[in-house]
Each structure stands twice: as C-alpha cells, then as structure tokens.
Amino acid sequence: MPQVHIRGVRHGVSAINIASTIQSYTGMGMLQARGAADRAVAGERVSVDVDDFHAVYELADLLTDMGLDAEADESDY
C-alpha cells in the first residue's frame, strides 16, 4: 500500500488542518488522523497509508503546500 511520509512541519501549521487533510485522503478516523498530525507537529516521522496510487501524490503535494516535509512512497504498492 502506498504511503506518505511526513518528516517535518513548519512552525505555525495547525494540527487540526493536517488531521483533516490526512483524514480526507486516507479514510482514517479523526482521532487516528489527529494522533498522526500531533506526532508530526511534535517532530516525529509519521507515515500514513493511502489506498489510491494517485491520491498518494496528491496528498503529499497538498501537505507540502501546507508547509510539511512530505514525500510519496509507492514502493509498497
């Protein structure tokens, strides 16, 4: 399954906005998406699974535009 790896977050990016974006593309529940967003904001490396091969690139691009260091990884697809 393709993943998006998040390695850093620019200061001031809202965890709620990150969680909402992750939830929209992954189908995660809000609590799980918020946990991933909180870990990313705290500086941890976070990987999220995306079911759709094309959506993995869209999510990585969107998160990058929001100020995150995000990279698509389709190697597990």
Protein language model regions, located:
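Short, amphipathic alpha-helical interaction segments embedded in low-complexity terminal/linker regions
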Residues: 1-77
